[in-house]
């Protein structure tokens, strides 16, 4: 832990011997989470709903780093599948130490374009977006995997994915923003509940990525001449570094939050 006068910095950030569950593992941000956990020494239960080929490519790129990365197909819209997957991980790995919930995104039809307004949208895609991001991407996995972590002697770490849109109005993405604001609030509430009532070493935090490309097709972000499209340009203009982030730039943050290096950090986004 961080309490000794002398410490091994490498050991402080190490996840050797631990098991991490990563949801949304076939996405760009989920892929960064898989890399982070594997490079830090954890075995990884990598959940995907689609994009198995991308996940297989990622696992091949990571190569042999002395850990097991096992893919599982899990539907984030199904609480029953998430619960069953928690049982599967316990069977296959014997325990859960880290959970990183990256599954989420906008459902088609849940956001309005420059030619529309919120009043032009159907209700169902907005409902599905909230279900995916708040429940399937956060609430249900926190319950399913968190229940398996309550008695861990060394505690554990749950890392949810919120978004900058939870705190800043981004044109068109109202349902998504509302869901991600819920993720941040849920994270804070769950952190207090788990630490006070179950295990003071069990921590819950969230990260709120800014402008990252994720798996968006290039034509959604760039014009044929390589310049940003208008929507992408607005995101870049609102970013102090004046560029999109690279998914691998999340690795350091995720390793910190997953490891003993952040043992006194909980309930933050």
Where are these regions (language model features)?
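A glycine/serine/threonine-rich, flexible loop-to-helix segment
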Residues: 11, 56, 114-116, 198, ...
């Amino acid at each position: 832990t961080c309490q000794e006068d002398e410490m091994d910095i490498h050991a402080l950030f190490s996840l050797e011997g631990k098991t991490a569950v990563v949801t949304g593992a076939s996405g760009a941000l989920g892929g960064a989470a898989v890399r982070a956990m594997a490079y830090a020494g954890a075995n990884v239960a990598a959940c995907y709903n689609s994009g198995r080929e991308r996940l297989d490519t990622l696992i091949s790129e990571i190569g042999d780093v002395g850990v097991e990365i096992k893919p599982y197909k899990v539907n984030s819209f199904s609480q029953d599948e998430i619960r069953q997957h928690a049982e599967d991980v316990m069977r296959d790995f014997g325990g859960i130490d880290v959970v990183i919930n990256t599954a989420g995104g906008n459902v088609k039809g849940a956001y309005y374009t420059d030619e529309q307004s919120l009043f032009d949208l159907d209700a169902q895609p907005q409902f599905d977006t909230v279900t995916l991001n708040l429940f399937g991407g956060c609430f249900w996995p926190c319950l399913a995997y968190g229940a398996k972590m309550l008695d861990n002697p060394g505690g554990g770490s749950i890392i949810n994915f919120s978004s900058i849109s939870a705190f800043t109005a981004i044109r068109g993405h109202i349902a998504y923003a509302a869901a991600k604001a819920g993720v941040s609030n849920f994270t804070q509430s769950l952190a207090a509940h788990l630490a006070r009532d179950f295990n003071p070493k069990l921590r819950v935090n969230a990260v709120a990525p800014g402008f990252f490309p994720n798996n968006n097709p290039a034509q959604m972000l760039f014009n044929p001449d390589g310049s940003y499209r208008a929507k992408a340009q607005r995101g870049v203009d609102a970013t102090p570094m004046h560029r999109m982030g690279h998914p691998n730039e999340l690795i350091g943050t995720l390793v910190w939050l997953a490891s003993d290096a952040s043992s006194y950090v909980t309930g933050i986004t």
